Amino acid sequence: MSLITDIYAREVLDSRGNPTVEAEVYTEAGGVGRGIVPSGASTGEHEAVELRDGDKDRFGGKGVLKAVANVNNVIAKEIVGMEVTDQIAIDKAMIALDGTPNKGKLGANAILAVSLATARAAADELQVPLYNYLGGFNAHVMPTPMMNVINGGAHSDNKVDFQEFMIMPVGAPTVREAIRMGSETFHALKKALEADGKVTSVGDEGGFAPDFANNEEPFEYLIKAIEAAGYKPGKDVAIAFDVAASELWNDEDKKYKLHWSTGEEYTTEEWIEYLSDIIAKYPVVSVEDPIDENNWDDWVTLTNKLGKKVQLVGDDFFVTNTDYLAKGIKMGAANSILIKLNQIGTLTETVEAIEMAKEAGYTAIVSHRSGETEDTTIADLVVATNAGQIKTGSMSRTDRLAKYNQLMRIEDNLGDVAKYKGIRSFYNLSEQAKQDIENR
């Protein structure tokens, strides 16, 4: 193996046209790796800090020249000369160099860019695919995609309170077929929306964001689209949705408010019943952030009620942080974690969170952010860790499709070794729950 000889960062743009950090790592044996950091719109308050310049005269304050300078002038001095394959030592060195619990000094965007670029440089030097470098010979499970085809909440300008409505091709035999099923359902949905005179422009993650009469109408359109594409709802293609409940929670009143639609308010008990009714009515297999991120006891209450029936995913709740995840596991809160690289800020900590979840019987869903790039690391990471599920947007926008295309390449490379588990990737649910989802 060889040592890192140079690190260089620059400011580039993400899928929303906002600045982000790109880093390149070079080794003495000729290895080169590049990593680009994504950015979120709906963010958890406990996420690692994304360092922005704050200069209102430049990119509206969203520039990242400070983070870029931290890579070129601070991180590079520490990391150049280290062994490129010693990912853990490199990540720990950057964490120590920052010295804050939330990476607020150097910026998680600066640290993550170098972390990702390091792994790619090592894989390039060894002349192996990234998934193979990260996961070894056991990397073989192709993920069940979670495709965001209808946007609401903070991801749109419509009157829908829930942030994302997704389809999951749980009955597909391969990831290539799963992507085909998702694409066909996506186009069937577009036709159904157009037939009813609804807008079919797409949002940040490639999903449609038309106006709807209420929060249940998107589910009805998903059912219609799945059937129009020739599939059975629940059995072939299941439904998932992201509530993003922290966006709806009023901490003063201690109530959830549907402020994008009707303005109705719910106590926690009423809210849990409201969500339970929706889950019972439609073939829902997964619900993300159904409870406010700071209401731990309420998460436990919901998990006790629904945890064997449906996947309950902590995103803002866990923020890819092993401390929060360990607390949730101990309390019995949620049964799944959404994995976002930039929530925690290094590849090492991300893999630690995935492994902790799997050991506890929680599923781990490797996820994109709403502000994405052409970087396809998450496609390799989900296969490397055999996580089993990926959330990376809809069937439009190149920044989303880049990940799906990479998954198909990986499946081709793996050949007969590749295994797509579909509904079996939900090892956190009972067999009866899976049957019930198929029959709704």
UniProtKB/Swiss-Prot annotation:
Catalytic function, reaction form: (2R)-2-phosphoglycerate = phosphoenolpyruvate + H2O
Localisation per UniProt entry: Cytoplasm; Secreted; Cell surface
InterPro entries: Enolase, Enolase-like_C_sf, Enolase-like_N, Enolase_C, Enolase_CS, Enolase_N
One GO molecular-function entry: magnesium ion binding
Keyword Isomerase annotated: no
Active-site residues (renumbered): 205 (proton donor), 340 (proton acceptor)
Record-given protein name: Enolase
Gene name of the encoded protein: eno
